[in-house]
Amino acid sequence: MSIPKELRYSQEHEWVRVEGNTVRIGITDFAQSELGDIVFVELPEVGAQLTANEPFGSVESVKTVSELYAPISGKVVAVNEELNDNPEYVNESPYDKAWMIVIEPSDLSEVDNLLTAEQYEQMINQD
């Protein structure tokens, strides 16, 4: 299972990549493996305001529907429309092709409250 060291992680299994003044968000390799084959992804519109720890969308797999939670607060500036036609990217490439949204954070320092790769790995190994 892949847990890239340069990313930050939420306890709800979202990953965060800081890219200058924006933040790219997706779900982790662990999350996609637990969900099974992803068949549908529901994401917010560009311009939507997100609040940290509040739902912003969902992923549907053959097993279940799981909500996505915003790891930090901010405004959605990009949505990965590729996932509409290719939800399987979430299983195949969770950290690259399957990024979900890009936000302009309300406060970039919120990223510091997220888990490091090491902390995330410890958390999932406790479950």
UniProtKB/Swiss-Prot annotation:
Residues with the N6-lipoyllysine modification: 63
Cofactor: (R)-lipoate
Bound cofactor: record note: Binds 1 lipoyl cofactor covalently.
One GO term of the biological process aspect: glycine decarboxylation via glycine cleavage system
Record's keyword annotation contains Lipid metabolism: no
Role according to the record: The glycine cleavage system catalyzes the degradation of glycine. The H protein shuttles the methylamine group of glycine from the P protein to the T protein.
Protein name per the record: Glycine cleavage system H protein
Organism: Anoxybacillus flavithermus (strain DSM 21510 / WK1)
